[in-house]
Amino acid sequence: MIINQLPETYNIFAPIIDIMPVIPILFLLLAFVWQAAVGFR
């Protein structure tokens, strides 16, 4: 019964799993922009 419910749960979290690899890149870009903004002052 639990195994039959897994696909439904996966469909709910699928978008989050697709976005997860992009999050570290966004953090790197945010850190780079922040350092650039502080450096330009």
From Swiss-Prot:
**Record field: transmembrane:** 12-32
Concerning Pfam families, the annotation shows: PsbK
Q: What do the Gene Ontology cellular component annotations say?
A: chloroplast thylakoid membrane; photosystem II reaction center
Q: InterPro entries, alphabetically? A: PSII_PsbK, PSII_PsbK_sf
On the tree of life, the source organism's domain of life is Eukaryota
Keyword rRNA-binding assigned: no
- Keyword vocabulary terms for this entry: Chloroplast, Membrane, Photosynthesis, Photosystem II, Plastid, Reaction center, Thylakoid, Transmembrane, Transmembrane helix
Work out whether the entry's keyword set contains Transmembrane.
yes
Compartments where found: Plastid, Chloroplast thylakoid membrane
Example GO BP: photosynthesis
Give the membrane topology, semicolon-separated if more than one: Single-pass membrane protein
Propeptide intervals in chain numbering? 1-4
What does this protein's UniProt record list under function? One of the components of the core complex of photosystem II (PSII). PSII is a light-driven water:plastoquinone oxidoreductase that uses light energy to abstract electrons from H(2)O, generating O(2) and a proton gradient subsequently used for ATP formation. It consists of a core antenna complex that captures photons, and an electron transfer chain that converts photonic excitation into a charge separation.
Checking HAMAP family in the record gives: PSII_PsbK
Per UniProt, subunit arrangement is: PSII is composed of 1 copy each of membrane proteins PsbA, PsbB, PsbC, PsbD, PsbE, PsbF, PsbH, PsbI, PsbJ, PsbK, PsbL, PsbM, PsbT, PsbY, PsbZ, Psb30/Ycf12, at least 3 peripheral proteins of the oxygen-evolving complex and a large number of cofactors. It forms dimeric complexes.
Give the similarity note: Belongs to the PsbK family.
Write down what this protein is called: Photosystem II reaction center protein K
Say which species the protein is native to: Cyanidium caldarium (Red alga)
Its organism's taxonomic lineage begins at: Eukaryota, Rhodophyta, Bangiophyceae, Cyanidiales, Cyanidiaceae
Gene that this sequence comes from: psbK
